């Protein structure tokens, strides 16, 4: 069995893959340890052109090599802040109103993908399989093919794939999808995402979709599939129970003074429906006066992309809403909303989930939402909390024991909170058991192993007539001065 090569925008360091690492890092690292391999991507550092060209930096942990490169300021601005997060992220989350398109940012996005491919080629061996992750790397396989790589290359999209009517708002949409079709296997989180991609192929790419998720488009044959990412529920349950007697939990219980607790944890992002959530909680306090002083919402929302104006605005909006609602409903000994704009250790969060009566997870659009799955897994089986979950989270299709809501309906969310707060223990246990059965059936290991099994089953590409192959020997395209034309832009 060949090595696994994982490529992602950011690489979790060896330290980060242990301890409190998130589900994806744990799952990917587990697969890498099984076969040996490389985790390749951006280090998170913005560096000079000289330092960027000198990479990748290699760090070894057993049979796993962590290979990272830095980005120049221009590449960071165009590839990451620009096209990835100012164009693709909003459009793929159905927020065309927040998207912008700049040709130079799109050019930078493609340039960085080509440069990353050029860096990776030197690390490849003939029987490696390559697994790229997420929207930052849509053209990455095309860039590898241009380098002569014939290895199996798979792609998994962690965020939603938008309907064709939304996607075509990006001017180079056809070029992007054509690049995406250079992968051998494209994995989606949900049936809806896969169907949206198939719809685009048939309507706009003049391609065909055949049984089994097989696609023919742009002169390529590829496979598509639905692979619902999961968690390791029993591990989470064990850790949540272990942490429930820690001081931070005792402090929270003491401060609540017997009040019910609603927990929400999200990155500070407009796709998460945070303002709508606060307004639904306000509806609860307004429509059910008996809950005033008797229930607290804790919203943990660590900052993300703080240098992007859209994210600065959502932070301001959320702070305003929290202040307004607290100003209206607080008492001398009661604050309805505790809004924390900071990061918490993952295992601390699991123990807080276990302490709460409701998990309130209501994104406007989300690929899967692992917080919803972690909330369920962290519960006490004898006295579980209730998950109130958006119908637009990918997890809603699996977690049918949840109270499913429309995040645009504040009254409907309020009614779900009322129901959850009053739900008898036998119903809560029944719903918890339904959700846990789903988590165990399709845990993180199943997601990982099923995807990699399908990728390994894809037929290998035939080598190009010039003998180029997947060993890393494919020649880089050169400019007249002899430098690769995909070298990083100067800072």
Where are these regions (language model features)?
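Catalytic cores of carbohydrate-active enzymes across secretory and cytosolic contexts
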Residues: 1-491
